[in-house]
């Protein structure tokens, strides 16, 4: 399962309840900067903005909506991807067991991680990388992440493993100015670590 599908132009215009925003690409400086923390308590305006991003992700996974607006399906989007260098990101997807992950996270921190690593056998994708770059991206198989979540409106501690852990790490990397393409082995993109778990 990829992190996003379909082709998007350099600056994708995303429609949501009469609001527009563009998705910045890997060529833009904001995606290579370490984002700053959000002041807490979060304002109602910022909370609603992040909730909008969660709703956008839901809509992007509807084929009719995605086709109508010419956008890619996504499971996560971080603030730097829309030109805002702040430590927050939105997540929405269901895992293979039907468990729903719906979060708008502010100032997330990975507080622990496993020695075991994992990777997506299909490779990763990103809304900020218009054309997918092939190769394996190795990440922690299991993480514990703490953040303030605007969906539940409270502090949360998330214990994630497998595909969900990969998705959250992908978005977390955006907050540190790192893209998945930065983590692909340039000499051997499909190098298989025998100790890692293929997902």
Name these PLM-found stretches.
Residues 7-199:
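Positively charged
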């Amino acid at each position: 399962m990829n992190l996003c599908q379909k082709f998007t132009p350099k600056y994708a215009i995303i429609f949501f309840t009469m609001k527009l925003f563009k998705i910045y690409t890997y060529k833009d400086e904001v995606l290579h900067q370490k984002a700053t923390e959000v002041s807490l308590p979060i304002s109602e305006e910022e909370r609603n903005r992040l909730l909008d991003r969660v709703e956008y992700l839901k809509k992007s996974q509807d084929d009719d909506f995605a086709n109508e607006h010419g956008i890619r399906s996504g499971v996560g989007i971080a603030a730097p991807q829309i030109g805002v260098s702040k430590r927050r990101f939105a997540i929405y997807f269901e895992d293979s067991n039907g468990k729903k992950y719906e979060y708008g996270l502010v100032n997330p921190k990975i507080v622990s991680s496993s020695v075991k690593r994992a990777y997506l056998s299909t490779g990763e994708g990103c809304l900020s990388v218009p054309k997918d770059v092939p190769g394996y991206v190795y990440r922690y198989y299991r993480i514990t992440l703490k953040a303030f979540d605007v969906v539940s409106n409270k502090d949360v501690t998330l214990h994630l493993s497998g595909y969900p852990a990969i998705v959250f790490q992908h978005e977390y990397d955006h907050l540190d100015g790192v893209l998945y393409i930065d983590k692909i082995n340039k000499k051997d993109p499909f190098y298989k670590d025998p100790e890692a778990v293929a997902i």
